[in-house]
Amino acid sequence: MPRRNDLNKIMILGAGPIVIGQACEFDYSGTQACKALKEEGYEVVLVNSNPASIMTDPELADRTYIEPLIPEIVEKIIEKERPDAVLPTMGGQTALNLAVSLSKSGVLEKYGVELIGAKLPAIEMGEDRELFKEAMARIGVPVCPSGIASSIEEARQVAHEIGSYPLIIRPAFTLAGTGGGIAYNQEEYEEMVQYGLDQSPMSQILVEKSLLGWKEYELEVMRDLADNVVIICSIENFDPMGVHTGDSITVAPAQTLTDKEYQRLRDYSIAIIREIGVETGGSNIQFSVNPANGDVIVIEMNPRVSRSSALASKATGFPIAKFAAKLAVGYTLNEISNDITKKTPASFEPTIDYVVTKIPRFAFEKFPGAEPILNTQMKSVGEAMAIGRTFQESFQKALRSLETGRFGFGCDRHETLPTLSHLRSQLRTPNPERVFSLHHAFNLGMTVEEIHELTAIDPWFLDKLEDLVKTEKYMKQRSLKDLTAADLRYIKQQGFGDRQIAFATKTTEDEVRAYRKSLGITPVYKVVDTCAAEFEAFTPYYYSTYEPEECEVLPSDKPKVMILGGGPNRIGQGIEFDYCCCHAAFSLSDAGYETIMVNSNPETVSTDYDTSDRLYFEPLTKEDVLNIIEAENPVGIIIQFGGQTPLKLAVPLQKYLNSPDCPVQTKIWGTSPDSIDTAEDRERFEKILHELEISQPPNGIARDYEESRVVANRISYPVVVRPSYVLGGRAMEIVYSDEELERYMTYAVQIEPDHPILIDKFLENAIEVDVDSLTDSTGKVVIGSIMEHIEEAGIHSGDSACSIPYTSLSDNVLTTIRQWTEQLARALNVVGLMNIQYAVQGDQVYILEANPRASRTVPYVSKATGRPLAKIASLVMSGKTLEELGVTEEFIPQHVAVKEAVLPFSKFPGADTLLGPEMRSTGEVMGIDSDFGKAFAKAELGAGVILATTGTVFVSMSDRTKEAAVPVVRELIDLGFKVVATSGTQKVLREHGIEGVEVVLKLHEGRPHVIDWIKNGQIQFIINTPSGEESQLDGRTIRRAALDYKLPIITTIAGGKATVAALRSLQDHPLDVKALQDYLG
């Protein structure tokens, strides 16, 4: 069937901010969909609240709305734009839930808008647990014994019918298992049921008999309007049932299915997608197989593009989201051409002659109090993927891609082996470190059978891992020169890195590299081509392997530039850096360079086969990057866009490129590694600041507790302490006493023994300011934007809301900031981007830090000002001047854009929600409007904060902030809110003339206390600033209850003032919507 000509304008719903369970994969799918529909001549309207996404670039869609993804706002956009259809399958769970809401409320019918990609009955049947179960019964596909409950009483009845624990709780219409879990007894069960009902938007849960120990598989399936169905990829979970698939190591294609079992899953998948009624596009279907007898049960399906779709796309080269968008407008699979081969249609199922492994990355260290245990609720914050000719090769490459300080399956550090009893408990309970517990187990002599008994991991995988430990022992018994060429090739084919070989043979990585090359053992690069080399591939998408085959890298005469990506997402380094890498690839391709992207993250736009001219899906380690440099011989390498990942490689790369035996003429483009090191090295940086007469907070350096105590007492408490060389404020804290400092030093020095601890005076009640600037090789400096933070200095900049333009900075302060930025950019010889953070106390400005690289604010600044900083910076690095590019002065927009952080506390039930100097947000949203109040209100709504415009506010302030809270409380009363407070706060308010404030009891003062008020729905939002030790427990419990009951909680005075401005705006007039293209002219 040809494309539908009855549609002209199509709205795509995005996924919003990056959260656990919904990350960059939806930027990837949304970007592909925008391109595919525009290619077909449709007018595209995009709605998404995430400024860090490529899809919200103004040139990607015809009309781009960076607005909150809530039904009331999307209705206004529909009313304004009058699209013919809405495509909801590209924006994850957020977009599906929005589509259901707009459909059921009658909005789509009112404006004559059609749902394409998935109709309402298909979405509901795929997402509603009861309807899905009924559908499976109709087609004879077995499901797990289960029952649906909408109350505790119903849940008790379901548990009685199933008959035995453990039971699995799965809330309906939630993302990444939010609110779910495994209950081993009745008490746990009832707690989890209540939590699950609260988390489900429709207060419905599915209770299932536990299939712990069964194997888990996924199939990626596509269907068109002519009822053609293709299976794109099978994926096997290394971890058995009981661990969320997003937290499990996964392998494609499935390794341990018999042909008969695979055919059965395939037949079931085709029957399921037809019965559910997904007419056009992709679905992900999850199965469980009993290893004892081969019984199959279907677990669930996602009637949309998913995290697994992104993985399947990158694993096979088959662009699922692009094809799904084309199917949604009427094409059939056989009418769509495969871009990679240019010969085969999309109905030609991909075949792959390699193995792909994905390993998740966790951030439990960011959430003290949260147990590092994996279950059915997803907790990982990112993932790395690797490709190899064997499972062993791809598995070890994926482990070293994670960037967690490990270089493969062990064999990379001296370790004390645990006791057998401790090890058994580590193996029995799924946790992020379990993969290395397997390594310990083989070293302690445990058998495959014993380990399988404890973990239920398939013996096939365990055999392969045991084989790696045998190779490790073989290497440790020999010197490097004892290893023959055949030995070394076999070792490299198993995925061992040079670093691991060096550890085993007691040599250095450089010695291993030199010896390996002297024996002629170098990697070859193979193409990901969707067809196992049956047809020629036209898109250079490569992976390395050590099989003795020919290298498939295509020669080229164009000058090449290599861009090093950011690796797996983590807190502190996410989509913002991928955005910068993509922009570099786009602008340098347009300038005539051949761009080479190196990255290991399957979720991102940068690892899409058509973002750069060449893509290497490889780990970002010294060994892997040097191998690619030698294969490609680029003229330049860009390291300043991928966050800390490529920066860590700067010095070793420079050392290699300067060495006499380097066979290539490659240069690192932009700011030199030496200048980057100067900014990172406290002593070198201070010397420059001293020469330039730039102030910084009083500070010092310490290597142990005694030194740190002397420094802290010299500069006076409170102080900020942190290790040198960090991103995302890792292990950074504000301490108020010698006792707190001693606890910190004991904990933090273990983290970075090689680097000293930095101690700075903490500037209380200071305003923090971020500046992004551009500098060219002539020393011309142009400020991209000056951003004013809403939370005061001391809250990590990545967790703080901020505003463009600034709202309260004086002319004197602005002059100082601009002068210091220019002086520092020149002193550091910056070429490209630099980010500087300042703190302002009154009219006194202090510099906090300077980073001569792309920062996480670059996409936000680019969207707010319309000036693509990363594109400009990459052209500057290629030798262009800012004058030539027409960028000569700072641009201050007439509108206001507010960026707000999105935090993942709901996934970590034990963690405190209080913000501090260590970054914990996973993503961000932007609100844009004509004034600050409206823009901040939109940012809060986009971040999921429900701002009530009437009702009761509970106020509990620390002694330090009680005075400052008075004006905020006065304004809330002016706005018509009822204010209630703790006795101490009420006393201060009364002293300042605020009468009639009711006292609410603290937890230890009797009942009904504040938590009772929260649970009874008597409070609409909370202002609670953290107090001293004795009331910390109260504050923590209140903050946690606010999160569980979805109440807005403000923990700073500055946040209170901004919220008052937003509430005033919302009361004055309803929010309006406007396309980004109209703001930017």
Curated annotation (Swiss-Prot):
Residues bound to Mn(2+) 2: E300, N302
Binding annotation for Mn(2+) 3: Q837, E849
Binding site for ATP 2: R722, K761, L763, E768, G794, I795, H796, S797, Q837, E849
Catalyzed reaction equations: hydrogencarbonate + L-glutamine + 2 ATP + H2O = carbamoyl phosphate + L-glutamate + 2 ADP + phosphate + 2 H(+)
SMART domains for this protein: CPSase_L_D3 (SM01096), MGS (SM00851)
UniProt keyword list: Amino-acid biosynthesis, Arginine biosynthesis, ATP-binding, Ligase, Magnesium, Manganese, Metal-binding, Nucleotide-binding, Pyrimidine biosynthesis, Repeat
Keyword Repeat: yes
Known cofactor(s): Mg(2+); Mn(2+)
Region (Carboxyphosphate synthetic domain): 1-403
GO cellular component, as recorded: cytoplasm
Paired cysteines (S-S): none
Region described as Allosteric domain: spans on this chain: 945-1081
Superkingdom of source: Bacteria
Positions bound to Mg(2+) 2: E300, N302
Residues binding Mg(2+) 1, per UniProt: Q286, E300
Listed PANTHER family: CARBAMOYL-PHOSPHATE SYNTHASE [AMMONIA], MITOCHONDRIAL (PTHR11405:SF53), CARBAMOYLTRANSFERASE FAMILY MEMBER (PTHR11405)
NCBIfam families: CPSaseII_lrg (TIGR01369), PRK05294.1 (NF003671), PRK12815.1 (NF009455)
Family: Belongs to the CarB family.
HAMAP family the UniProt entry points to: CPSase_L_chain_A, CPSase_L_chain_B
Function text: Large subunit of the glutamine-dependent carbamoyl phosphate synthetase (CPSase). CPSase catalyzes the formation of carbamoyl phosphate from the ammonia moiety of glutamine, carbonate, and phosphate donated by ATP, constituting the first step of 2 biosynthetic pathways, one leading to arginine and/or urea and the other to pyrimidine nucleotides.
Protein name: Carbamoyl phosphate synthase large chain
Gene: carB
